Amino acid sequence: MEKHLVMYLTRKSIMLLRKYLLVTEFQVSKCGSHIVKIRRDVLYPKRTKYSKYSKCRCSRGREPDGTQLGFGRYGTKSSRAGRLSYRAIEAARRATIGQFRRAMSGQFRRNCKIWVRVLADLPITGKPAEVRMGRGKGNPTGWIARVSTGQIPFEMDGVSLSNARQAARLAAHKPCSSTKFVQWS
């Protein structure tokens, strides 16, 4: 059954999912074909069940999923619950890659791997400036990802401890939530 689900995906979407999220084919088939690449390298859902969602609260407690390092030796762990915009996720990813390229030059393409474990899948709505109250919620303007306390949004491997710590420090300045560096033991 899993093979049939993978057949519905285009080759490009599977390649993008495996390149940027580094997931297996089984996870891609569970995810479906609704994730596409747009606006440089930002991934977000092509369509959702509803076009507008309520804000909801970010969970303050620790969740079992995503609180342990799953892929790499180093990572960043969120210290508190919050929301990450798709722009902040992409900026943090680019800052990490830029740090590795400056520090490692030729070794970057051979050894280094970065995993982004959050996906901005909730639309944010907004109304234009100087519009009167009422008349609906507003049009979707961007995408966010909910991050709970203790969740690991970024992981990295194939680099030295000092380079990973420096890259995590640079990436922590991009999102609005506080993070700390974690190491696999």
From Swiss-Prot:
Say where the protein is mainly found: mitochondrion
Which terms in the GO cellular component ontology are assigned?
Answer: mitochondrial large ribosomal subunit
Biological process terms from the Gene Ontology for this record are: mitochondrial translation
Disulfide pairings: none
- Supply the PROSITE patterns for this chain: RIBOSOMAL_L16_1, RIBOSOMAL_L16_2
Q: Which residues form a coiled coil?
A: none
Which domain of life does this protein belong to?
Eukaryota
Question: Does Mitochondrion appear among the keywords?
Answer: yes
What name goes with this protein? Large ribosomal subunit protein uL16m
Tell me what organism the protein belongs to: Zea mays (Maize)
Give the classification, highest ranks. Answer: Eukaryota, Viridiplantae, Streptophyta, Embryophyta, Tracheophyta
> What gene is it encoded by?
RPL16
